[in-house]
Amino acid sequence: MSQLTQQIHSSDIGDILENSLNGIRPKKDDYLRLLESDDVYLMGLVAGKITRKKFGKKVSFVNNIILNYTNVCITDCKFCAFYRPPNHEESYTLTLDEIEARVKTGWDMFKIRQVLIQGGHNPKLGIEYYEDSFKMIRSKFPDVGVHGLSTSEIDMIATVEKSSTKEILSRLKDAGLQSVPGAGAEILTDSVKEIISPKKIDSDDWIRIMKESFELGLPASATMMYGHVETNNDIV
């Protein structure tokens, strides 16, 4: 019996880990047990073993920069120290030249392969601002991918343009958008979102816009912000 097997058999989450090694995905109750367990090291060992079995020892990463094009926002999320209301003395919106300069610096110094573009919900920015930015980046820096705009930003643009979010996504893709980040999800439980980000889109709209992204051939991800008012059940 290997040392890993012995550790699994003596762990309070051993049954879940053993199932995972055998290709059986955890159920919802299992996820809650994993979240509440302090056997983090063993989880890491098992996760590493599964990863090596599937992909070998190859790893990858994306060398990128985060470009916050504006901090103007009308959403007032409780956890955000970044945003400033419209006309605030510390508010800003980058010009096309400023965006180009930042991407150029990233390319010249670090040979970035991607720029993550995110900002506030600025009601003064129409879709042309984003289209011009994406087209400029893709034309002047063809080796730099455009990974941009949370679902809530996309919804904001649709509101400004009086258009559908799918139409906005389609136009942004045509302009050079290549993938959509997972921001804006926080915790996909509306009772939590109503406390920390009541002016943002709800969970159903977040999921809907992500589905629209996939339908248009735009890969997307999901992020989770935890450690505030959520419970473990909300996370699971």
Where do the protein language model's features map onto the residues?
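N-terminal pre-triad scaffold of radical SAM enzymes
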Residues: 44-87, 91-118
